[in-house]
Amino acid sequence: MREETPEHPAPLRSGYTTGSCATATSLAAARLLLAGVVSEVAEILLPKGQHVPMPLVFCRLIGNGDEGAEAGTVKDAGDDPDVTHGAVVFARVRLVAEPGVIFRAGPGVGTVTRAGLTLPVGEPAINPVPRRMMTEHLAELAAEHAYGGGFEVTIGVEGGEALALKTMNPRLGILGGLSILGTTGIVRPFSCSAYIASIHQGIDVARANGYTHLAACTGNASEDAMRAHYGLPDIALIEMGDFVGAVLKHMKRAPVERLSVCGGFGKLSKLAAGHLDLHSRNSSIDLERLAQWAAEQGADDALQASIRAANTSQQAVALAHAQQVPLGDIVCRHALAVAREIVPPQVNVEMFAIDRRGLLIGAAQ
């Protein structure tokens, strides 16, 4: 292993999903019931074929065992900024007569209350891949021990109800806690796959509940602007952050009648330049391009030079507006052109730009 230095930092460390944690803990609890083995580590097989040892913080009978067994592990998200990192994910398993697996939401795991997700209303928020992982591991364990019955599996997350408030679950209609997630079993640092998945879920839930006008917003200020402008409810507001591309591309699979995209002027200027990831590490504000666009609308040489020399995009648009050059509208028109290249023609797209006070300073339809 090489030594980490400022010039050569160590690679970012991957972690494991809550689905992997649930699989390991349910397997350990079931093994205790069927084989009497108290496990310190549970080895699981991930969907892509990797065998992973998951350390446990407890594995014990509940009562004298008549009520089942439980096991827990500490969620390790690696170097990903995951809200569940360090939380204890646990499973309580009870043997039942009917073959198969019954899933329950324990403390800290949410319940689906709105249509549009991959799970029916009323089901615990344990996603399909984690369900399949648990079912396969438990079926293999049952076969090893010639057990013909089934399992009732309750998954919980300590502190999950509070952690869920930091996620999109309440807006998606997943109430009471977190979702048990994962498609590969592995968390890739800063992959943002979970965030993008939640954007898609937000769109799907809104459509399933009859909303035909959605507003995709970069943050709280743009959400407030869309609430004030259109009176849209929270379910129709899609918190996209920097991932405007995730919204626009999803329209191909899940179109709506009307899509309003709203963000800060700087973010919208990046979209106008063709960037679909608006984060500063992946795209930057092109002041030269803003000056050129202003020139096309009558900006003189002095204003163009001022825009090129501006410290921020907000300063650039303020300079332009002070001389009656509608740079906010110009940027929105270019952003709209980019969006229309992606979304299907039946989606009526519009753009809104706001300033730092949350006031609308540009629009295009």
UniProtKB/Swiss-Prot annotation:
It catalyses: Co-precorrin-5B + S-adenosyl-L-methionine = Co-precorrin-6A + S-adenosyl-L-homocysteine. Pathway: Cofactor biosynthesis; adenosylcobalamin biosynthesis; cob(II)yrinate a,c-diamide from sirohydrochlorin (anaerobic route): step 6/10. It is an enzyme of class 2 (transferase). GO terms for molecular function: cobalt-precorrin-5B C1-methyltransferase activity. Keywords: Cobalamin biosynthesis, Methyltransferase, S-adenosyl-L-methionine, Transferase. It comes from the Bacteria. InterPro entries: CbiD, CbiD_sf. Belongs to the CbiD family. This is Cobalt-precorrin-5B C(1)-methyltransferase. It comes from Paraburkholderia phytofirmans (strain DSM 17436 / LMG 22146 / PsJN) (Burkholderia phytofirmans).
